[in-house]
Amino acid sequence: MFVARSIAADHKDLIHDVSFDFHGRRMATCSSDQSVKVWDKSENGDWHCTASWKTHSGSVWRVTWAHPEFGQVLASCSFDRTAAVWEEIVGESNDKLRGQSHWVKRTTLVDSRTSVTDVKFAPKHMGLMLATCSADGVVRIYEAPDVMNLSQWSLQHEISCKLSCSCISWNPSSSRAHSPMIAVGSDDSSPNIMGKVQIYEYNENTRKYAKAETLMSVSDPVHDIAFAPNLGRSFHILAVATKDVRIFTMKPLRKELSSSGGVTKFEIHTVAQFDNHNSQVWRVSWNITGTVLASSGDDGTVRLWKANYMDNWKCIGVLKGDGNPVGNSCQGIFGSSVGSAIQSLQNSVNGTSSSGRKHS
């Protein structure tokens, strides 16, 4: 059975994001109190705050970990129109600091003229790259050419999405058959604007990102978006958090069917749509194999979704903050599968937790 542990976060305002590192033993939180906190898991399973610092001059919307191959590196983004990259260093300068760690700001990315709403490191096979999106509808992709010098970042790409951007997700596939791809969600509140999820793909010929697809069926504001880890699948799975939970499959069409030399075209299907939260859904997060999806909503629950052998998606668990499963609101199974799902979520490849908006 899933065990819930309450953590006294000591944030002074709303907590907007919770992010696990690659191994699931470190956690970062960010808040409207303009701070980021880093938590480490002890041997007995307790979480201890090991660092807390003021990061921005506005609400901090998102925080995310780089792959540990690049060291202990965080990125944050804020209403103050900036994103920042932070690195943990172990003090060696004098006896007092030796062995103690602290976080140092390596760079501030100041290209946005409006609130920076999401920040995500690219999959590690692409090198140390970072994507941001902002309320003015621009996605920016930066690269650190020297991974030993995180103070130098170059702006590689600017993508104009024409809609206010709220969230981004890299396609984690490392297959050479798949070009780098990024999904962008919009929280534009106008019901007349369709297609609030856009997919951009990198074109080797033009060396630019071009729009590959628009999910026209998504017309409500999008709060979160997440590609599933791709373990040998020939197609992609994308989860979208809006007023409900939606799961899409994207199957690449054969090259002769898509324009030669252009972007890949996809056959897109909505394979699941769940309104069980009966409220806005704020976060979606996959486990490490891309087989279990967690969602969290304003109903105060985390719901777990999994496909059966017929590829029908079902709810397999509903969790509340007190650790108790919620009775009959989910037809599925509880017990070991839920526990293992939560464990795999903590070891999620993209390090993102499924926690939605939380109060401190």
Swiss-Prot record:
MF annotations from Gene Ontology: structural molecule activity
Transmembrane feature ranges: none
Gene3D superfamilies xref list: YVTN repeat-like/Quinoprotein amine dehydrogenase (2.130.10.10)
Keywords: Cell cycle, Cell division, Centromere, Chromosome, Chromosome partition, Kinetochore, Lysosome, Membrane, Mitosis, mRNA transport, Nuclear pore complex, Nucleus, Protein transport, Repeat, Translocation, Transport, WD repeat
Family matches, as SUPFAM superfamilies: WD40 repeat-like
A biological-process GO annotation: attachment of mitotic spindle microtubules to kinetochore
Compartments, record wording: Chromosome, Centromere, Kinetochore; Nucleus, Nuclear pore complex; Lysosome membrane
Regulation: The GATOR2 complex is negatively regulated by the upstream amino acid sensors CASTOR1 and SESN2, which sequester the GATOR2 complex in absence of amino acids. In the presence of abundant amino acids, GATOR2 is released from CASTOR1 and SESN2 and activated.
InterPro entries found in the cross-reference section: G-protein_beta_WD-40_rep, Sec13/Seh1_fam, WD40/YVTN_repeat-like_dom_sf, WD40_repeat_dom_sf, WD40_rpt
WD repeats: 10-49, 55-96, 111-152, 160-210, 217-258, 276-315
Alphabetical list of Pfam families matching this protein: WD40 (PF00400)
Gene Ontology cellular component list: GATOR2 complex; kinetochore; lysosomal membrane; nuclear pore outer ring
Domain of life: Eukaryota
Family under the similarity heading: Belongs to the WD repeat SEC13 family.
Subunit record text: Component of the Nup107-160 subcomplex of the nuclear pore complex (NPC). The Nup107-160 subcomplex includes NUP160, NUP133, NUP107, NUP98, NUP85, NUP43, NUP37, SEH1 and SEC13. Component of the GATOR2 subcomplex, composed of MIOS, SEC13, SEH1L, WDR24 and WDR59. The GATOR2 complex interacts with CASTOR1 and CASTOR2; the interaction is negatively regulated by arginine. The GATOR2 complex interacts with SESN1, SESN2 and SESN3; the interaction is negatively regulated by amino acids.
Function per UniProt: Component of the Nup107-160 subcomplex of the nuclear pore complex (NPC). The Nup107-160 subcomplex is required for the assembly of a functional NPC. The Nup107-160 subcomplex is also required for normal kinetochore microtubule attachment, mitotic progression and chromosome segregation. This subunit plays a role in recruitment of the Nup107-160 subcomplex to the kinetochore. As a component of the GATOR2 complex, functions as an activator of the amino acid-sensing branch of the mTORC1 signaling pathway. The GATOR2 complex indirectly activates mTORC1 through the inhibition of the GATOR1 subcomplex. GATOR2 probably acts as an E3 ubiquitin-protein ligase toward GATOR1. In the presence of abundant amino acids, the GATOR2 complex mediates ubiquitination of the NPRL2 core component of the GATOR1 complex, leading to GATOR1 inactivation. In the absence of amino acids, GATOR2 is inhibited, activating the GATOR1 complex.
Protein name in UniProt: Nucleoporin SEH1
Species in which this protein is naturally found: Xenopus tropicalis
Name of the gene encoding the protein in the UniProt record: seh1l
